[in-house]
Amino acid sequence: EDGRAVPVFNDKHLSFRFDHAQEMVKLSEQLGFPFMAGSSLPVTFRLPSVELPYERPIRDALMVGVGSSDPMDFHALEALHSLIDRRQGGETGVEAVQMIEGDAVWRAGDDGAWSWELLEAALSRSNQLQGISRTEAKPQDLIRNGQLQALVKNPAAYTVWFRDGLKTTMLMLNGAVGDFTCAVRLRDPD
């Protein structure tokens, strides 16, 4: 109670209720401390340690996440944005968002709504594949061995269309992975 204030970082969004979030901001202003919210994933370590070059055109991107809806999909979305916002033209705004769950996710992949190739690339970077990778310490290809659909009981897919034409997909694959991975397909600058 010496009258000093320290900055506060609130992991994820401020609250699931707008009135609670407003109260948190109001208190930070009254008490005079800097207040920020967001995900810590955009600033955590990456394996491999990679940053997309600034101003590179991106064709599409796919993020794989794990965890319950709301807190963990927020982390996946912010981690994805930390990569794609470096693209040519930067952040231009969101045009539309669609979320689907269950078997519709696999059908959407089969129909080309999201890329199995990008999913394969993202899964190849996972340090925490589940199934026999975990129980028997065996490497596996979750897509080709048919285990992906067996391990993931209720997949969720978020597709985000941006105003500059970029389309991204975020797949929440509880049961298949224990970490967050991403794959980005660059567009030829010409």
Describe the predicted segments one by one.
Residues E1-S39:
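Beta-strand-loop-alpha-helix segment that lines the small-molecule cofactor/substrate pocket
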Residues D2-A5, E55-R56, G89-G93:
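Short helix-terminating capping/connector loops at secondary-structure junctions
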Residues L14-F16, L41-T44, G67-D70:
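Solvent-exposed loop/turn segments at secondary-structure junctions
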Residues H20, M24, P57, A76-A79:
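Internal, well-ordered alpha-helical segments in soluble enzyme and binding-protein domains
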Residues A21-Q22, P48-V50, A108-G112:
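Short aromatic-enriched loop/helix-cap "lid" or pocket-rim segments at secondary-structure transitions
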Residues E29-G32, M36-A61:
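Rossmann-like NAD(P)H-binding beta-loop-alpha module
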Residues A61-L166, M172-A176:
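Rossmann-like dinucleotide-binding domain that binds NAD(P)(H)
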Residues A176-D190:
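C-terminal helical cap and adjacent loop that interface with cofactors, partners, or active-site loops
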